[in-house]
């Protein structure tokens, strides 16, 4: 598959590394060896921190919010589908006429193909969120990363779609992710607004927490995980009602593809 059109020849990490090396050589020539090592040490520190900054395009191009000139916000839901949460979520989205993108986990999609069909039947789009949600997937070997992501692509292909976007588990990136996604034709999508709901384990005041920080252009990260018990599920439903009602009234929600000016998935010929 052809590389994605947003793929850059040299990442920020590669350019920064080259600059650090040149500075080290210059300082080594004009200053002390200890001084010369500073740019390289700083570069290593940045490389260690960068994987955990999901909004930074350090190792590869990352889209975390709108392109310039685009208004609105996009709703995204991670980790599903689940019988205990996805149908309710679809019902509420339909009630308030809100479009969403579901970044699904491959093993969940394989276990519940009827929910994938339901998501599509409601007019929503689907992205790849890895097969097992290994939090450190992006730090694994090239082979492991590609097998994991490709397995999810294959599962969703059986539903008649080909996702064109990938969200790494918990937003962790690495230089190993770039060539894999380029080969598979996937664009990395992260987020610019989140509530730290811990996969719907903490839904207290979810609506107010979102609305206080939500801005035009945001990609909002929420979760499609079933809450811990029936009482928590009722709380989650009530919070979603409040959030979706406010978003519907403000007419702020647009499809993710519209926000980023890039397709999220393609339908396969059957």
Residue ranges and their predicted role:
Residues 133-140, 228-231:
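A short acidic, helix-capping loop that chelates divalent metal ions and anchors anionic groups
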Residues 77-79, 104-106, 128-130, 167-170, ...:
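A cross-domain feature marking catalytic cores of carbohydrate-active enzymes
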């Amino acid at each position: 598959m052809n590389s994605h059109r947003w793929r850059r020849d040299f990442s920020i990490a590669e350019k920064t590394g080259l600059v650090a090396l040149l500075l080290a050589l210059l300082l080594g020539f004009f200053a002390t060896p200890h001084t010369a090592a500073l740019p390289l040490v700083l570069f290593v520190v940045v490389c260690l921190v960068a994987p955990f900054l999901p909004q930074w395009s350090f190792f590869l191009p990352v889209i975390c919010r709108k392109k310039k000139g685009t208004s609105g916000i996009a709703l995204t839901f991670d980790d599903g589908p689940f019988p205990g949460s996805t149908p309710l979520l679809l019902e509420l989205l339909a009630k308030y006429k809100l479009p969403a993108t579901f970044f699904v986990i491959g093993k969940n999609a394989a276990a519940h193909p009827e929910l994938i069909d339901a998501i599509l039947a409601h007019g929503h789009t689907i992205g790849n969120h890895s097969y097992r949600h290994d939090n450190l997937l992006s730090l694994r070997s090239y082979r492991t990363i590609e097998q994991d992501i490709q397995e999810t692509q294959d599962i969703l292909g059986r539903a008649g779609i080909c996702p064109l976007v990938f969200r790494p588990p918990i937003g962790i990136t690495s230089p190993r992710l770039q060539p894999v996604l380029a080969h598979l034709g996937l664009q990395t999508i992260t987020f610019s607004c989140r509530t730290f709901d811990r996969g719907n384990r903490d839904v207290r005041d979810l609506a107010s927490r979102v609305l206080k920080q939500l801005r035009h252009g945001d990609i909002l990260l929420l979760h499609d995980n079933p809450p811990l018990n029936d009482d928590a599920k009722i709380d989650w439903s009530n919070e979603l009602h409040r959030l979706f009602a406010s978003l519907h009234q403000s007419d702020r929600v647009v499809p993710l593809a519209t926000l980023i000016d890039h397709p999220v998935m393609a339908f396969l010929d059957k």
